[in-house]
Amino acid sequence: MSWLQVVVLSVLQGLTEFLPVSSSGHLAIASRVFFEDDAGASFTAVSQLGTEVAVLVYFARDIVRIVKAWFAGLFRAGQRSADYWLGWWVIIGTIPISVVGLLFKDEIRTGARNLWLVATAMIVFSFVIAAAEYYGRQARRVEQLTWRDSIIVGLAQCLALVPGVSRSGATISAGLFLGMHRELAARFGFLLAIPAVFASGLFSLPDAFEPVGEGMSASGAQLFVSIVIAFVVGYAAVAWFLRFLVRHSMYWFVGYRIVLGTVVLVLLSAGVVSAI
């Protein structure tokens, strides 16, 4: 990989990871349109470590509070607060993507990054996001979450394994369909992503150096710089996005997704870019 590609894709990763627009889809599209080759699922997974560190830093107080409450409630039934249960919901909600990710890891790294699929997913899932915004009651608080909610949002997170869907788009939409407030759905989705993304990134480190079957190799220095850039840009993006959701809906991103997906389909049909 060239340093220009590393910098551009890392900035793009940081900007899009927390927005409902699909960071993996954007990286796959940008790689083919501007660099004529896919950086690969392994590079994407490793660069996501930077954005997940950004989530850890941004939610540090929340995470510490949840961990303390979880351990306290584990040994003292009388101290089982909402944060204690939230800790359990994050653990339970991580199970679906762990299972699906292991079962379909080869498909995710190769066939799922076909630009026809990416562009189609970008467009189709836009309507799911719009429906979630339209039908969501936005009445439920964190104290009202149950294990069923965590399983459903966890299953929705599995959809993000398909580039073009969007992890935040899928989890926030699921939360809205379940009646959660928009900001709660976003925060819960971001917390839910931490274990899965860290596991995926660490698991993909060897393949980022020597990709198997697709993608280009990256040096250790390039991967380190990628993680740092994604962290800095990602921290700014998550802070902005959560403030944005307080007063605005995700409709703003629906139109963008449809336009981008359509443009990619046109470029593919015209033979301007390669699908794989």
Swiss-Prot record:
It is an enzyme of class 3 (hydrolase). GO terms for cellular component: plasma membrane. The keyword Transmembrane helix applies. Keywords: Antibiotic resistance, Cell membrane, Cell shape, Cell wall biogenesis/degradation, Hydrolase, Membrane, Peptidoglycan synthesis, Transmembrane, Transmembrane helix. Its main location: membrane. Catalyzes the dephosphorylation of undecaprenyl diphosphate (UPP). Confers resistance to bacitracin. This is Undecaprenyl-diphosphatase. Bacitracin is thought to be involved in the inhibition of peptidoglycan synthesis by sequestering undecaprenyl diphosphate, thereby reducing the pool of lipid carrier available. Pfam families: BacA. It is found in: Cell membrane. One of its GO terms (biological process) is regulation of cell shape. It catalyses: di-trans,octa-cis-undecaprenyl diphosphate + H2O = di-trans,octa-cis-undecaprenyl phosphate + phosphate + H(+). InterPro entries: UppP (IPR003824). The keyword Ribosomal protein does not apply. It comes from Mycolicibacterium vanbaalenii (strain DSM 7251 / JCM 13017 / BCRC 16820 / KCTC 9966 / NRRL B-24157 / PYR-1) (Mycobacterium vanbaalenii). Belongs to the UppP family. The chain crosses the membrane at residues 1-21, 39-59, 84-104, 115-135, 188-208, 222-242, 253-273. Its EC number is 3.6.1.27. One of its GO terms (molecular function) is undecaprenyl-diphosphatase activity. It is a multi-pass membrane protein. PANTHER family: UNDECAPRENYL-DIPHOSPHATASE.
